[in-house]
């Protein structure tokens, strides 16, 4: 897919409108984690260095359109951004009369989700945004799966529409992992429900050499292979779907390696006693909360041989240390592997942070839903419009 890149644009004296993702956790006006603000800095600084006037826009939370409340304001975000940039950042409540900005200055439009028509991708609002710039820069991969006025309509009407540094890097990394992967391609897909990730599992079944499943998803796959799982979280109605995924991969010469041993408990609790056992020994009141050490070793060996690893989801309840060994072992295997690795999803990022392997993953995706939809092979509307504008 070809799209215009920010790095190719002449920005001297131009007005750059950048759609960033600064939807940070806020409690009582205090930012809980500023990772997303920091992730946007390279694109902002690139535009400033190139001589542009920089206008930013982002959403924050889920406010009601047309009904601004103090807690929906970007004021705390703007204050933090100003600290990080070391320069003032203006917050603009009303942009309809235009925005006066000199090259080297930075301003932020108030929360785009307060604007009527934002969620519905309203063309009139898109035109109003586009009128504020010479170059529109999309740099919010986390919102790329949504067609909204600040991600899609604006890109239709801006004089130039391009991908920012973060979005370009994200698309390059995902393309490398899925469109032309170094083989073997190993995907780790874990989570509580097959139903939420069935389309991903089916899409990956056509691409991967090894599909490692974990969590409640693995329990459903164990059921599909005729194993007893006690009172573990699973979806009995999706057993046939799981069988179909297994058959599809095996028909291509790949596999879904399921654990031969597991770590069980009688209750789901931080204080629960962990018991490691062979899958054949699982009894009616057991809950499987992690893969066993033998399974972890076997999967780590598969990862060690991989050319590409795509990771979405921890394989056990790693928040409780006694059920974290499986995720920790796989995380360390990915960190030590020579494979190109890409990881995404909130729980996955928490596991990466917990086991201190951030610097050992080739690419950490910033997009939750967008990352998953890309894995499914779905077209991301905000990326598709950039490709269209590049023609």
From Swiss-Prot:
One term under GO cellular component: cytosol
Keywords: ATP-binding, Cytoplasm, Glycolysis, Kinase, Nucleotide-binding, Transferase
GO biological process: gluconeogenesis; glycolytic process
Pfam families: PGK
Involved pathway(s): Carbohydrate degradation; glycolysis; pyruvate from D-glyceraldehyde 3-phosphate: step 2/5
Primary subcellular site in the record, as a coarse category: cytoplasm
EC code: 2.7.2.3
Reactions it catalyzes: (2R)-3-phosphoglycerate + ATP = (2R)-3-phospho-glyceroyl phosphate + ADP
InterPro entries per record: Phosphoglycerate_kinase, Phosphoglycerate_kinase_N, Phosphoglycerate_kinase_sf
Binding site for ATP: 197, 319, 345-348
Binding site for substrate: 21-23, 36, 59-62, 113, 146
Oligomer status and interactors: Monomer.
Matching PANTHER family: PHOSPHOGLYCERATE KINASE (PTHR11406), PHOSPHOGLYCERATE KINASE 1, CHLOROPLASTIC-RELATED (PTHR11406:SF23)
Full protein name: Phosphoglycerate kinase
Organism of derivation: Chromobacterium violaceum (strain ATCC 12472 / DSM 30191 / JCM 1249 / CCUG 213 / NBRC 12614 / NCIMB 9131 / NCTC 9757 / MK)
Phylogenetic lineage: Bacteria, Pseudomonadati, Pseudomonadota, Betaproteobacteria, Neisseriales
Gene: pgk
């Amino acid at each position: 897919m070809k799209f215009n890149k920010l790095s190719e644009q002449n920005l001297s004296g131009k007005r750059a409108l950048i759609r960033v993702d600064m939807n940070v956790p806020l409690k009582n006006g205090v930012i809980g984690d500023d990772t997303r603000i920091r992730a946007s800095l390279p694109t902002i600084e690139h535009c400033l260095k190139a001589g542009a006037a920089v206008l930013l826009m982002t959403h924050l939370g889920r406010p009601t359109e047309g009904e601004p409340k103090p807690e929906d304001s970007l004021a705390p975000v703007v204050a933090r951004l100003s600290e990080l940039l070391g320069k003032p950042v203006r917050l603009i409540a009303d942009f309809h009369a235009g925005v006066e900005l000199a090259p080297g200055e930075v301003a932020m439009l108030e929360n785009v989700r307060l604007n009527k028509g934002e969620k519905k991708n309203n063309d009139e609002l898109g035109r109003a945004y586009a009128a504020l710039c010479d170059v529109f820069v999309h740099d919010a991969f986390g919102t790329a799966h949504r067609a909204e006025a600040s991600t899609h309509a604006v890109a239709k009407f801006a004089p130039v529409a391009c991908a920012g540094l973060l979005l370009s890097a994200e698309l390059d990394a995902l393309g490398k992992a899925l469109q032309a992967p170094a083989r073997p391609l190993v995907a780790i897909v874990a989570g509580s429900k097959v139903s939420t990730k069935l389309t991903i599992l089916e899409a990956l079944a056509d691409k991967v050499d090894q599909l490692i499943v974990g969590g409640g998803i693995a329990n459903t796959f164990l059921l599909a292979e005729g194993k007893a799982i006690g009172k573990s979280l699973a979806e009995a109605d999706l057993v046939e779907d799981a069988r179909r995924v297994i058959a599809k991969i095996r028909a291509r010469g790949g596999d879904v390696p399921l654990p031969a041993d597991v770590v069980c408990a009688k209750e789901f609790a931080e204080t629960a006693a962990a018991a490691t056992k062979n899958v054949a020994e699982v009894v009616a009141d057991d809950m499987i909360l992690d893969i066993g050490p033998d399974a972890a070793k076997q999967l780590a060996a598969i990862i060690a041989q991989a050319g590409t690893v795509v990771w979405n989801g921890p394989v056990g309840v790693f928040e409780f240390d006694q059920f974290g060994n499986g995720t920790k072992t796989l995380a360390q295997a990915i960190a030590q592997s020579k494979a190109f690795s890409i990881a995404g999803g909130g729980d996955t990022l928490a596991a990466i942070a917990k086991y201190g392997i951030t610097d050992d993953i080739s690419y950490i995706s910033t997009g939750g839903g967008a990352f998953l939809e890309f894995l499914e092979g779905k077209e991301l509307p905000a990326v598709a419009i950039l490709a269209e504008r590049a023609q």
